[in-house]
């Protein structure tokens, strides 16, 4: 059955700031306390969405979350009216304010893991929300992510959205950032590659930085998503590259159809994995980048592999890259050699995503890939699909509500909280989502 890969991109939130919250993510730590520009960040993301939609790649948007997230501050013992809660936490424990104000939900590659209907035992599209257990600021995301996904994929005839796994380290799950699908046409059954960094009872793990994904979590997600057991491979990421800042697999590898574009040091037992994929994926084409041409450190600094690999109708592929790749002589030289070589990649598209990149999120972090048949695509909430009208509407919305300068100190401003809630209230109407945010549900309950 004919199917399309639809990229659902996260819209950057109003509290986008640089707080260095993500240990193991080198860009996040490096840019701590830099002044951010939320308006520019949102517009950079929207420009990528629109450019890809205009190029014929189906594109949709996933809204930001409610931030600062007051309910969690109340759970941590801060009381009073919302404005009083903000004032108390800013004075007594400002690090909590930064955590509950993170705009990290923009990186929707971590929102969920997706199973297309062609791979599912029950023939539905499955999405299992990621618990993001390894980082406090990200572990807050799961309930709102589930609400948003259910408002977008609302037809139970076609879609099943599963809540996140229990919030324990044993079941740490980072979503689609540690998941790749390989095969032929999107609508045909494919092989799902789940990548993990640690496993209970196995000592081989990184030393410097945490391995966020467990094998136990990957196996549970595959079960929840009803992936046909004959179409699954579980592979361990090389712990040495995690220690070099490869905190998700999508920082060192990206797949599309029969192609796996990755660094030669991406996986533990990489030769064995490539043999397995060759035997199970017809026409499998690994594009393994040698360390002598691009080091792991340079791949992390430029986010070469945090790119999007997209298929055109003629079978050729486009590699969507951050501007940092073009600015690095060695990486750009490699990419031009790749373009000239015998493989499906026929075009490089470069985008300026500096606001997201400075927090450690490139093109691939910003998108959740969902393979949909024509019928399934028609069942998606149409208001989230990117087109000329939505692009214009969202740019106007950003201009109206977003600040062009934000520091950690600004997070205590009660006006920022009010601006954010008003903005999201408007957005839920624009995107026909209903009351998906806790502040909207509280308002309804108190009325």
UniProtKB/Swiss-Prot annotation:
Enzyme class: hydrolase
Gene Ontology biological-process entries: arginine catabolic process to glutamate; arginine catabolic process to succinate
Catalytic reaction(s) noted: N(2)-succinyl-L-arginine + 2 H2O + 2 H(+) = N(2)-succinyl-L-ornithine + 2 NH4(+) + CO2
Pathway(s) of this molecule: Amino-acid degradation; L-arginine degradation via AST pathway; L-glutamate and succinate from L-arginine: step 2/5
GO molecular function: N-succinylarginine dihydrolase activity
Keywords: Arginine metabolism, Hydrolase
Enzyme Commission numbers on file: 3.5.3.23
Subunit field text: Homodimer.
Protein name per Swiss-Prot or TrEMBL: N-succinylarginine dihydrolase
């Amino acid at each position: 059955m004919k199917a399309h890969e639809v990229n659902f991109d996260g819209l950057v939130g109003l509290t986008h700031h640089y707080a260095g919250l993500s240990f193991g993510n080198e860009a996040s730590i490096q840019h701590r306390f830099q002044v951010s520009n939320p308006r520019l960040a949102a517009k950079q993301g929207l420009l990528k969405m629109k450019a890809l939609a205009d190029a014929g790649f189906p594109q949709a948007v996933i809204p930001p979350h409610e931030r600062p997230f007051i309910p969690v501050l109340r759970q941590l013992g801060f009381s009073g009216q919302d404005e009083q809660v903000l004032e108390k936490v800013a004075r007594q424990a400002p690090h909590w304010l930064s955590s509950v104000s993170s705009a990290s939900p923009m990186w929707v590659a971590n929102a969920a893991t997706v199973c297309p209907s062609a791979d599912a035992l029950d023939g539905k599209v499955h999405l299992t929300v990621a618990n993001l257990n390894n980082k406090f600021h990200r572990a807050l995301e799961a309930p709102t992510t589930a609400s948003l996904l259910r408002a977008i994929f609302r037809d139970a005839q076609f879609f099943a959205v599963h809540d996140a796994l229990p919030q324990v380290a044993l079941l740490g799950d980072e979503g689609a950032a540690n998941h790749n699908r390989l095969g032929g046409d999107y609508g045909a059954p494919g092989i799902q590659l789940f990548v993990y960094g640690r496993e209970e009872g196995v000592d081989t793990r990184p030393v410097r930085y945490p391995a966020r994904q467990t094998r136990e979590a990957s196996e549970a997600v595959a079960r929840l998503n009803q992936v046909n057991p004959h179409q699954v491979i579980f592979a361990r990421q090389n712990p040495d590259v995690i220690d070099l800042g490869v905190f998700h697999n999508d920082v060192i590898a990206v797949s599309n159809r029969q192609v796996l574009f990755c660094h030669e040091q991406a996986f533990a037992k990489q030769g064995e994995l490539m043999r397995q994929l060759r035997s199970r994926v017809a026409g499998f084409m690994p594009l393994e980048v040698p360390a002598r041409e691009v080091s792991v450190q340079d791949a992390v600094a430029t986010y070469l592999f945090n790119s999007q690999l997209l298929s055109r109708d003629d079978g050729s592929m486009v590699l969507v890259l951050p501007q940092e790749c073009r600015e690095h002589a060695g990486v750009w030289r490699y990419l031009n050699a790749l373009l000239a070589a015998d493989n499906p990649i026929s075009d490089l598209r470069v985008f300026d995503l500096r606001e997201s990149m400075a927090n450690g999120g490139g093109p691939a972090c910003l998108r959740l890939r969902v393979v949909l048949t024509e019928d399934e695509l028609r069942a998606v909430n149409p208001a989230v699909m990117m087109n000329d009208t939505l692009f214009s509407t969202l740019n106007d919305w950003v201009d109206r509500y977003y600040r062009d300068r934000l520091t950690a100190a600004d997070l205590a401003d009660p006006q920022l909280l009010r601006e954010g809630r008003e903005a999201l209230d408007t957005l839920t109407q624009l995107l026909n989502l209903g009351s998906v945010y806790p502040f909207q549900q509280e308002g309804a309950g108190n009325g």
